[in-house]
Amino acid sequence: MIAGIGIDVAEIDRIKRAVEKTPSFINKVLTKGEQAQLATLKNQRYYEYIAGRFSLKEAYSKALGTGIGRHVSFLDVEIIDNELGQPVVVSHPFDGPAHASVSHTGQLVFTEVILEKGE
């Protein structure tokens, strides 16, 4: 049974500017595991990854119904790409499965997260 659905859109250039202005932005948004994946990327893909994780975590918090803040932080959720490049939610505070999808087009990243609960 679906417990929550969250969607988000982020501008890649806006995230790039945030990283360039405040390099610690990465430490506030990405877990150590996500930072390890990020370290393997270059050029535009580097910023797409950061924007994608930022947006996925926003979508996750919307599916949870809380938004990012007091109940869930960016670092409470870890999303790692599997060998096929699919984002997998490997760590999160919700008691049930979480499914993530991300798509990039031009300067935008679109994300969706679905949370499931048992019947």
Curated annotation (Swiss-Prot):
Gene (UniProt): acpS
Keyword terms: Cytoplasm, Fatty acid biosynthesis, Fatty acid metabolism, Lipid biosynthesis, Lipid metabolism, Magnesium, Metal-binding, Transferase
Cofactor(s) required for function per UniProt: Mg(2+)
Record's catalysed reaction(s): apo-[ACP] + CoA = holo-[ACP] + adenosine 3',5'-bisphosphate + H(+)
Cellular compartment(s): Cytoplasm
EC numbers, comma separated: 2.7.8.7
NCBIfam families noted in UniProt: acpS (TIGR00516), pantethn_trn (TIGR00556)
Residues the record lists as binding Mg(2+): 8, 58
Pfam families: ACPS
Name of the protein in its database record: Holo-[acyl-carrier-protein] synthase
Chief location category: cytoplasm
